[in-house]
A protein has these predicted regions:
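Mixed-charge (Asp/Glu-Lys/Arg
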Residues: 1-36, 42-129
Length: 129
């Protein structure tokens, strides 16, 4: 039986982040259990780059991933808001975390056939994070 649309969206969001990490030379670890609002962790060996502005050696970043096509609202000025459950928000705003955490939201198209396109010359993930 195929994955549900939500499970597939989660897989696409992980693949999207994996592609960005691979391109930039970072490692991505998928958390086995989401007990603390963390879905993936990104690590960099050494200093990220001279232009990144990061002055820390071997930085680590925890990420809570979300993917949706329905929980977005676009404001008149073009800004986009995302409806986030309070428990997820509360996990993100804890001030004394050892490792910083951010929310990454992949905006999916309603048409599942448009999520990922592949051919001999390209692999394309549509919409944006």
């Amino acid at each position: 039986m195929p994955n549900t649309p939500q499970e597939s969206m989660e897989d696409v969001s992980i693949a999207y982040m994996q592609g960005l990490c691979a391109y930039n030379g970072y490692t991505l670890s998928i958390e086995r259990r989401d007990n603390d609002g963390v879905d993936i962790t990104i690590k960099c060996k050494g200093y990220p780059s001279t232009t990144s502005g990061c002055l820390k050696y071997s930085p680590t970043l925890d990420i809570q991933l979300k993917s949706s096509f329905a929980r977005f609202k676009q404001k008149r000025n073009g800004d986009i808001t995302f409806i986030l459950e309070s428990k997820n928000y509360n996990n993100l705003v804890i001030g004394d975390r050892m490792t910083p955490i951010i929310l990454v939201v992949l905006h999916m198209d309603r048409d599942r056939k448009k999520w990922v396109k592949h051919s001999k010359s390209a692999l394309k993930v549509t919409k944006c994070a």
